[in-house]
Amino acid sequence: MATFRLALIQLQVSSIKSENLTRACGLIREASKQGAQIVSLPECFNSPYGTKYFPDYAEKIPGDSTQKLSEVAKECSMYVIGGSIPEKDAGKLYNTCAVFGPDGTLLVKHRKLHLFDIDVPGKITFQESETLSPGDSFSLFDTPYCRVGLGICYDIRFAELAQIYAQRGCQLLVYPGAFNLTTGPAHWELLQRGRAVDNQVYVATASPARDEKASYVAWGHSTVVNPWGEVLAKAGTEETIVYADIDLKKLAEIRQQIPIFSQKRSDLYEVEAKKS
């Protein structure tokens, strides 16, 4: 299939987990009605974003939140990229994205590889490592449309991850993410366009909607970028669904016109995965 429809759900996340789950599933159903074949929720879709919240909202996978995603994926017969939730496993907490196929099967589980530990004086200090542990594996899955690579938020800053996904045949990279009012205006779109052009792939980011009263205010602006670096669709800050038709013929044309993969100087440099 040369073209398929992608939907990004920019969810307004509250402190009430059950409400977040109900609204998320309702918006997934709405995206399905609009013809979406792959849908992504935002980072931390069932919980406020913050290290003080992660322990209280954490679940095992499978668990209540992921069970509901499995059920709605099967009901709508679509691929559901479950944003991320705080996951607890073997005494540790992770920021984890679970992906479900059209039959409700868990296809892959991506644990955020790069923890968001930053300090921008006078603006924002945040230490995910206060409560979270990093993942240690690459995460990709196949659909009838294309191969999809996964990252979560801060993972997008590390170009090597996107390069490895491109090497492994991914044509779409999806990053559920929650940039903030400092990093968002500076880098959110820039990073997406950079990853898309460098690797000649589609890049999509799904953010929570902005809540000015939250302890961590998300940037919003869920976005889809094509391999030419053009923004195909972009949300504002409110709760909404963003749609984009992903044209793989366009991707093939760009790779033919500017054949960077065959022109790489592997005699001089390489990016190598140290784990499978």
Swiss-Prot record:
Family of this protein: Belongs to the carbon-nitrogen hydrolase superfamily. NIT1/NIT2 family.
Job of this protein: Has omega-amidase activity. The role of omega-amidase is to remove potentially toxic intermediates by converting 2-oxoglutaramate and 2-oxosuccinamate to biologically useful 2-oxoglutarate and oxaloacetate, respectively.
GO cellular component: cytoplasm
Keyword Repressor assigned: no
Identification of the protein by name: Omega-amidase NIT2
Gene Ontology terms for molecular function: 2-oxoglutaramate amidase activity; omega-amidase activity
Species of provenance: Bos taurus (Bovine)
Binding partners and assembly: Homodimer.
